[in-house]
């Protein structure tokens, strides 16, 4: 990724007054929860709920169940990217993440947050001295500013273009993503796999 330009979209781009909004969901690139183990524990379900406010801020709430009876670990490591490709001439869209909160009804949920050299925010969840051997549910919430790409160079629409889960090394048995907001959606699309070559089911309502 070095050597490419960066398109700074840190300023908020609101939804109010948009003629059309395209929602594009990607499920492989940078954002990747991993377990504290060589191989990630499989995920039984992963549900993501995103609410877009009028000022273009995305409020993310996600719940996932990890099965540590299959692969022992200490908890997930959420890797939240602060940039992704999509601009003109190889440029990156950049955005800000804030208000990260993680909880679990059954497992240790203390967090240790760092930022790597690529700018990804890494949130390590769990107790370093406790290994898990059962199924455990985790909930993570955070706010993303700058995900609305105005007049995207390819679609010429205002896009909510987001990598939902990233390069997750373990098995995900069920994944759902719901995006809601105050404006109509013109188009919706979803891709998964390496290089986003495999389409996944998507639908939209409101226009």
Q: Where do the model's predicted regions map?
A:
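Residue-level marker of intrinsically disordered, low-complexity segments enriched
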Residues: 7, 21-23, 41, 46
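Bacterial N-terminal signal peptides
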Residues: 19-31
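Bacterial N-terminal signal peptides that target proteins for export
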Residues: 4-21
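Charged, low-complexity surface segments at secondary-structure and domain boundaries
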Residues: 5, 25, 81-85
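Terminal, compositionally biased non-globular sequences in eukaryotic proteins
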Residues: 2-3, 8, 33-37
């Amino acid at each position: 990724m070095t050597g490419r330009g960066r398109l700074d979209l840190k300023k908020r781009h609101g939804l109010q007054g948009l003629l059309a909004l395209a929602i594009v969901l990607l499920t492989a690139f940078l954002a990747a929860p991993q377990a504290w183990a060589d191989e990630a524990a499989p995920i039984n379900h992963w549900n993501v709920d995103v609410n877009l406010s009028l000022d273009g801020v995305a409020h993310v709430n996600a719940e996932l169940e990890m099965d540590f009876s299959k692969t022992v670990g200490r908890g997930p490591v959420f890797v939240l990217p602060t940039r992704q490709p999509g601009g003109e001439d190889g440029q990156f869209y950049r955005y800000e993440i804030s208000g990260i909160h993680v909880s679990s009804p059954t497992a240790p949920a203390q967090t240790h947050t760092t930022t790597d050299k690529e700018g990804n925010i890494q949130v390590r969840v769990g107790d370093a001295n406790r290994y898990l051997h059962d199924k455990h549910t985790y909930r993570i919430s955070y706010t993303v500013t700058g995900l609305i790409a105005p007049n995207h160079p390819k679609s010429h629409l205002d896009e909510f273009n987001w990598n939902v889960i990233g390069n997750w090394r373990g098995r995900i048995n069920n994944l759902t993503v719901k995006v809601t907001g105050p404006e109509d959606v013109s188009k919706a699309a979803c891709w998964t796999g390496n290089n986003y070559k495999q389409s996944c089911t998507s639908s939209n309502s409101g226009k």
